[in-house]
Every structure is written in structure tokens, then in C-alpha cells.
């Protein structure tokens, strides 16, 4: 423990479970995983704070309403339940939203959970089969690793799953950190019922430079409201930046004017591990037999954890994978000679 556990994304993220459809592979992995979370829901302890609150994708105008309709068709084609809401129906469901929004797409299967406790529960479920050793790793070589104290350990397989820090052990991985700001309010039970996301979120989520903000709000089971989101490249500074937070809050107030009177109790930052195509690397390193990669989940690590784990396990043990693993294989960026593909 101690100094070697650097800012895990699990502890600082939003814990949203969202079916994202930027491409078919992202939707396949997120939808499969959300269904897995849903089957675990009955067994999750209360401290995991799982809620099947659903998401409302908000359309501010006619152009965003057209985007909502495109999204509806993509989700339905993949078997994900969803429905369009007109302006009046949206007002009924979430009266705190500003008047004048064009409508929304409701995705009832989406949810939220408190990821650190869910991760702890998953580890505990493994029971005595899992031996935990907390130590800093300074080098990996195939299925061998060297600890900071100089000892080498070897195994049949080594899985690298350390997010933005993966590049420190494997320099050729195409992972860039994307900084995000988050804020949580005091308790205001009953203010929000669904997770709210603006349809402009997608263009913010995939901007490849600069700083972008998009409105994202979540009702926590405590009655608190969780606010995001911002994205910044080319910084590793964990400090909360006033101007970015201010932009994010202005965006939130644009959608939820009533928030102006609410107390914010804490703001913090985290880093997402972004890949060039927005999909994680799940599979064996083509140049290092025995080294398996599970990195690059960007903002969907909690959502896609179950599917990612099952895809990796199926490859490791030669079983039939639940989804086509091809889109996530590291070969799309890494060559068998060990260098990054141009």
C-alpha cells in the first residue's frame, strides 16, 4: 500500500453505468457489462450504492433532438431499451431542468454505483483463490515482473491493468491521460431522479485537444448531486483548476438553474486513460507473450469492467468469448516487433 498506490481512477470516477454508442464495439461492451452489473445488483451490498436510475440524454434544440433520434435507433438496433421524451414529458420527469429544452432520450437500463466498494466486493467474492500482494512494480517482461526492491516474480500470465500508469511499464502503449473535474453537493433529497447528460457530451468526450466541458449530473443515493464533466489533455497536474471548474458549473447551471442556491462540498480531479480510438486494449501483448493488457478504458472503466474481465478471461483460458474480442485487441496499435504501429 502507501505511496505505490497512485490515484486509481476507480476511487475518483463518477461510477456511472452508461450504454455508450460512439461505435458498435463500445456499445456491445457497455451494454453487455451493464447487464452483468444488473444481474449482480441483488447481491451487491448496500454500500455499493447501486441504483438503476436510468439516463436522460438531453436535447437542447432541434439539432440535438435529431442526434437523440439517431442514438435511439442505434441503441434499439443493439437491443437496448430506450424511448424519446417530448419537452412536456421531460418537464414531468425532471421539473428542476430549465424550461425550453427540446426533449430527451431515456435509457432506463443505465445506472450508478459506488465503484470503490463494488471493486472491494468483487475482490472479496474471489475469496481465498486470490492472494493480494501490495508492492510497487518497476519493470515487466512478458509474464515476469520486477518489484521495486529488485525481486523478480513470474507467473503463467501477467495482466497489466494500471490505467494511465501503464506507459511507465510499457512505453509503447498509446495511452494519454485525460484530466477531469468533479464536484459533489450537500444533500438535497428528491432534487434529481435520473442521471442527466447533455447530448453535446459526445463531442466533448472525444475532443482530442484543449479543454471541453459538458453537463452531466447524477443523483446519489445520499441525496447529494454529483456534477461533471470536463476533459483536458496534456496535463498531469492533479490540482483543481478554478477556471475549468467555473466553466463546468456554468454549464450545469444552464441546465439546472436551481443549483445556484445549493452548497458544493467538495471538488476533485481524476485522470482517464484514453486510447486513440476510444476503446480499451484487451488481450495479449503481440510482442510480449504472457503479458496481457486491460487498459485504456477512458471514462467507461466502471461501466465496462465486467465485460472487459470476461473477454480477457476467455482469451486467457481458451474459452468462447461473450463478444467478438477483435475490436479491443492490442494488435490494432502494437506490432509483434514490439513497436507502436504508425
Features from the language model and the residues they span:
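Active-site substrate-recognition segment that forms the wall
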Residues: 15-17, 48-50, 152, 157, ...
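Dinucleotide-binding Rossmann-like beta1-alpha1 core, especially the glycine-rich loop
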Residues: 14-93, 214, 251-253
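Helix-loop-beta segment of a Rossmann-like dinucleotide-binding subdomain
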Residues: 47-57, 82-87, 91-125, 230-234, ...
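Short loop/edge segments at beta-strand edges and connector loops
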Residues: 86-87, 133-135, 266
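Glycine-rich FAD pyrophosphate-binding loop
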Residues: 1-11
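Short beta-strand to alpha-helix junction loop
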Residues: 28, 58-67, 106-124, 239-244, ...
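C-terminal catalytic lobe of FAD-dependent flavoproteins
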Residues: 247, 253-342
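Helical element adjacent to the flavin cofactor pocket in flavoenzyme catalytic cores
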Residues: 105-143, 148, 153-156
Amino acid at each position: 500500500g502507501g505511496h505505490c498506490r497512485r490515484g486509481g481512477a476507480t476511487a475518483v470516477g463518477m461510477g456511472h453505468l452508461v450504454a455508450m454508442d460512439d461505435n458498435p464495439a463500445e456499445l456491445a461492451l457497455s451494454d453487455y457489462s451493464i447487464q452483468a452489473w444488473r444481474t449482480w445488483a441483488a447481491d451487491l451490498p448496500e454500500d455499493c450504492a447501486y441504483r438503476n436510475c436510468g439516463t436522460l440524454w438531453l436535447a437542447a434544440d432541434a439539432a440535438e433532438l435529431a442526434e437523440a433520434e439517431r442514438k435511439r435507433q442505434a441503441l434499439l438496433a443493439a437491443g437496448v431499451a430506450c424511448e424519446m421524451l417530448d419537452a412536456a414529458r421531460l418537464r414531468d420527469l425532471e421539473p428542476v431542468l430549465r424550461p425550453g429544452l427540446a426533449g430527451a432520450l431515456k435509457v432506463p437500463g443505465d445506472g450508478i454505483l459506488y465503484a470503490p466498494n463494488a471493486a472491494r466486493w468483487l475482490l472479496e467474492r474471489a475469496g481465498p483463490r486470490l492472494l493480494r500482494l501490495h508492492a510497487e512494480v518497476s519493470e515487466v517482461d512478458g509474464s515476469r515482473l520486477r518489484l521495486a526492491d529488485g525481486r523478480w516474480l513470474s507467473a503463467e500470465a501477467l495482466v497489466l491493468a494500471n490505467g494511465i500508469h501503464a506507459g511507465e511499464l510499457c512505453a509503447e502503449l498509446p495511452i494519454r491521460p485525460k484530466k477531469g473535474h468533479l464536484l459533489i453537493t450537500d444533500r438535497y433529497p428528491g432534487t434529481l431522479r435520473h442521471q442527466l447528460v447533455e447530448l453535446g457530451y459526445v463531442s466533448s468526450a472525444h475532443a482530442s485537444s484543449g479543454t471541453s466541458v459538458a453537463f452531466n449530473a447524477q443523483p446519489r443515493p445520499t441525496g447529494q448531486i454529483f456534477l461533471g464533466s470536463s476533459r483536458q489533455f496534456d496535463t498531469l497536474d492533479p490540482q483543481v483548476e478554478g477556471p475549468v471548474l467555473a466553466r463546468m458549473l456554468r454549464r450545469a447551471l444552464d441546465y439546472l438553474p436551481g443549483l445556484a442556491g445549493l452548497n458544493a462540498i467538495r471538488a476533485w480531479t481524476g485522470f482517464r486513460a484514453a486510447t486513440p480510438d476510444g476503446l480499451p486494449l484487451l488481450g495479449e501483448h503481440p510482442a510480449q507473450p504472457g503479458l496481457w493488457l486491460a487498459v485504456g478504458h477512458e471514462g467507461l472503466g466502471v461501466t465496462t469492467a465486467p465485460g472487459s474481465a470476461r473477454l480477457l478471461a476467455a482469451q486467457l483460458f481458451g474459452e468462447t468469448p461473450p463478444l467478438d474480442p477483435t475490436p479491443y485487441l492490442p494488435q490494432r496499435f502494437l506490432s509483434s516487433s514490439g513497436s507502436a504501429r504508425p
